[in-house]
Amino acid sequence: MKGEVKASSLSPWRRESGLMTKKTVWIENLMGKSNVQFGTSGARGLVSDMNDEVCYAYTAAFVQYLEGVGELSGNGTIAIGGDLRPSTDRIMRAVAKAIVDRGYTPENCGTLPTPALAYYGLLQKVPTVMVTGSHIPVDRNGIKYTKKEGEILKHDEAGMKCQSVTFPRELFDEKGMLTVEVEPPFPHNSAIDAYRRRYVDFFGNNCLSGKKIGVYQHSAVGGKLMVTILSHLGADVIPLGFSETFIPVDTEAMRPEDIVSGRMWADEYACDAIVSTDGDSDRPLISDERGRWLRGDLAGILCADYFDADVVVTPVSCNTAVEKSGLFKTVIRTKIGSPFVIEGMQHARAMGARCVVGYEANGGFLIGSDIDRNGNILKALPTRDAVGVHIAILLLAIERKRKISELAAELPQRYTVSNRLKNFPTERSMAKIAELSTGDEGKDAKAIEAVFSAYFGKVAGINTTDGLRITFSNDEIIHLRPSGNAPEFRCYAEADTENRAEEINKICMGIMDKWRQP
């Protein structure tokens, strides 16, 4: 992705051969035809479905939508970046072409964490486009869009779906691939540098002095940057597990080999903690001194505690220890997905909350208001972030003279376990949820008990905020939810012991697997 955008590709309407014919596509129709669907803050799909034409059209629709709501006015800059997937570079070229053809300049921030690009957009007051598939398999990818003030929300997504975009028919071949050469500008490090300074300036040099931290890099786009930031903060940093091949690390469904590696590394190197992220480095992983990975929602509670939040916004799927801890004045529950968490944070700010934060079950942490700590200001970053979670938990342990395992043990002992069934048809999972949640509470309780009572007893409560969340009379919880951006069926389980939560999850996964066929 070196060099300048080719002059021959600047005009969307003419080439040397003469006048081009136009093609118009409606985004909502393209979604169905291409199988590339909108999920959280953008689009995701199989790489084979995300041809250049689809990626171009979606990005053009994003630009047009921003023009329609007055955020763009025919010229200016849009920052772009990407993760380390092999398909990312090609998709970034299609994104850059769409931006140029709409009269704007793509500013290439290179490969960097999603929150680093979003933060740069907030600082520069420009929209951003991040090419990333996050944690999903390498045969898939995605495009995540943010406005000048942060992530696109659900109403923005609806506005983008309503767009129609027009472009030269000859711009793409019969396979939907670009017929012109596109080279975005040479990448710069300004966004990465700003993200590094964000944490070093706030937390201070040498705040982690004396701590030995392992960094599980794998193929995370922020793997090297994590080492740099923690080193600047004074930690003794040990890079671990770097991979040239992309590894789809899911912070909610850890691979068995990553669980084993965490414990092995902690023992071998005597680490105080091991940290990592998913592929685009917006979802954290952090272990205790024994190499046991903390659940994302548990890490979120500890991070919110460090920042002294008075309002915590979190999806309905997250551990109820946040309420049971009594640490926070208000806990707001939302649907699953960062746009819903952001909307909840915006509401809390409008109601006058002092310090508003949010987190998800995947560990992604969102800061909804500026944080003042010892006279240093950490600016709001209302998008998922990972590095701040690592540092906050490490410093909380230092301040309280505790090991990370001890911090976790001091919270209410509620354990959550989640897993997913891959290649589970979305229409089938949604149909099964609909069978058990008709809106008639008595009828639904009986239907649920017919399936689950032999294992969990009577139903005490049903929550359909997002999927189907069932609380049983023994205070055990199961939450069944189709994924919003992949053919996956997730199950979250919560109980008073880790073994029981694992047992519940295993039972539910077995039941759900039998639902694949009508």
Q: Which residues make up each language-model segment?
A:
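Phosphate-binding and adjacent anionic-ligand microenvironments
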Residues: 271-273, 309-484, 488-492, 498-518
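Gly/Ser/Thr-rich active-site loops/lids in small-molecule metabolic enzymes
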Residues: 235, 239-241, 292-310, 376-392
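Short glycine-rich phosphate-binding loop at a beta-alpha junction
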Residues: 73-83, 107, 212-215, 311-315, ...
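Gly/Ser/Thr-enriched, mixed-charge loops and adjacent short helices
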Residues: 26-35, 46, 141-266
